[in-house]
Structure formats: structure tokens, C-alpha cells
Amino acid sequence: MATSMKLACVALVMCMVVIAPMAEAALSCGTVSGDLAPCLTYLQAPNNASPPPPCCAGVKKLLGAATTTPDRQAACNCLKSAAGSISRLNTNNAAALPGKCGVSIPYKISTSTNCNTIKF
């Protein structure tokens, strides 16, 4: 089970690196997935779970790294791609993650988010 989880995580990271929008964004999906790797158990947990401190540290680090509109759009696309790749994803936990970590982002972490509309 642990080996298959590790393999799934490696596959997820590889998919995100290949799919990452390379255009003008300096923020890569590898960075996003590395920052948010500690969040995987929370994202698969039942409703009302609490994210572990390393997860929130990664969320805050990612927020600090995404300083330009292209970076924020790239991070959004990476999050969207990752959300679609996580088996047993609890969409309520994904949407609640920023707030539970004490940060605010102007979009929902979801497979249906239109990342091209992010402008700030």
C-alpha cells in the first residue's frame, strides 16, 4: 500500500511537470507539488479534518512564491491538474485548505476553476 502511494505521488509529480504551462511563468508544477506534498493525507481525509502544520507551511510558501499573474495562473493550473489526479480527493477539504491554513486566494481549488481569469 505504501509503495503504491509513493508510486502514485511520483506519477502525479511527473504528470504535473510534463503538463506545466511553461510560457512565461517562473513557478513550476514541481515547485507547487513539492510545497503541497504534505497536504495529500488531508486532501483524502474525511470532512472537518485539519491540515497538518507542514501542509499549511507549504501553502503559505506557495502563496509567497506566486507573486505575478503568470505565477498565480501557473499555480492554479498545477493545483487544478493535481486535484484531478488525486484518488479519493475530498473536494470539500481541497476548497477549504487555504482558509484552514489562514490564507486567502481568490479562487476555489477545483478541477472546474478557470485559471485564465486570475488577474492580480
Curated annotation (Swiss-Prot):
An annotated GO BP: lipid transport
Biological role: Plant non-specific lipid-transfer proteins transfer phospholipids as well as galactolipids across membranes. May play a role in wax or cutin deposition in the cell walls of expanding epidermal cells and certain secretory tissues.
Keywords: Disulfide bond, Lipid transport, Signal, Transport
Protein family membership: Belongs to the plant LTP family.
Signal sequence bounds: 1-25
Name by which UniProt lists this protein: Non-specific lipid-transfer protein 2
Organism for this UniProt entry: Pisum sativum
Disulfide bonds listed in the record: 29-78, 39-55, 56-101, 76-115
Xref: SMART domains: AAI (SM00499)
Database matches in CDD domains: nsLTP1
SUPFAM superfamilies (UniProt xref): Bifunctional inhibitor/lipid-transfer protein/seed storage 2S albumin
Tissue occurrence: Expressed in roots, stem, leaves and tendrils of the mature plant.
